[in-house]
Design a protein with these regions (language model features):
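Preference for long, well-ordered alpha-helical segments
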Residues: 129-132, 144-204, 210
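A structural-propensity feature for long, helix-poor, extended segments
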Residues: 50-89, 189, 196
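Amphipathic, well-ordered alpha-helical segments in soluble domains
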Residues: 11, 34-41, 83, 122-132, ...
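Conserved phosphate/anionic-ligand binding catalytic regions in large, soluble enzymes, centered on
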Residues: 17-38, 144-162
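Amphipathic alpha-helical interface segments
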Residues: 80, 84-153, 157, 169
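Short, hydrophobic/aliphatic alpha-helical segments
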Residues: 3-22
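Amphipathic alpha-helix face/heptad-repeat signature
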Residues: 30-34, 62, 69-76, 115-125, ...
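Transmembrane signal-anchor/signal-peptide helices with a preference for the extracytoplasmic
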Residues: 41-53
Length: 210
């Protein structure tokens, strides 16, 4: 089943159910995609306007990046579900003999690594989404300024949610050095892009209330 082809109602119903997917990872990717789409909307409302003719080429370039990024995040909704399948299978392997225990440990380590790769990719995409939101807030139509702020907040939420999805998997890794490296990668993205998202929000809020 391709989760991205579900209706909004069906996706949310499945998210609320006991089904293994979608879960927090797929939901985070979808929220990030929505944030990027909001930014793209700001761009599309800006192009073709005489008032923003000087920014036309730059906005068109931002729109191209946003469209590609949205599609990337949409694909990550399904990728997160696909990554859960081998992880669930690994937990179900027998471990009665030393050989079975060794095999289960190896398979589980590989599955956990794969389960971390997707949320890290979502985080990377959300960082780009926050950068785009900052540009749209600065250069886009003032009539859609609030949407640029929403774009930053959506991507921020998805970024933080994905960091939690990294942490729940690294916590279970027996290779603690590798786990620490993945946690550090996530922490670096949070440290750099959460302040930028907050800056975009504060700037937008101040301009709207001026």
């Amino acid at each position: 089943m391709d989760l991205t082809q579900l209706s909004c109602e069906d996706f949310l119903s499945r998210l609320a159910s006991k089904a293994p997917a979608p879960g927090g990872g797929g939901a985070a990717a979808l929220v990030g995609a929505a944030g990027v789409a909001l930014g793209n909307m700001v761009g599309n409302l800006t192009t073709g306007k005489k008032k923003y003719a000087a920014e036309e080429e730059e906005i068109l370039a931002l729109n191209a990046r946003a469209e590609a990024l949205r599609k990337r995040l949409e694909a990550l909704v399904q990728a997160d579900a696909d990554a859960f399948t081998p992880l669930a299978a690994a937990y179900g392997l027998p471990r009665e003999t030393p050989e079975q225990q060794a095999r289960k440990a190896a398979v589980l380590a590989e599955a956990l690594d794969g389960a971390c790769a997707v949320p890290l990719d979502i985080m990377d995409a959300c960082c780009e989404g926050i950068r785009l939101a900052a540009d749209y807030a600065e250069k886009g139509s003032v009539l859609a300024l609030s949407d640029a702020g929403c774009a930053a907040l959506f991507c921020k939420a998805a970024l933080q949610a994905s960091a939690l999805n990294v942490a729940i998997n690294t916590k279970l890794m027996t290779d603690r050095a590798h786990a620490a490296a993945l946690d550090e990668k996530a922490a670096r993205m949070l440290a750099e892009y959460l302040p930028l998202a907050d800056e975009v929000y504060q700037s937008v809020a101040s301009r709207l209330r001026a």
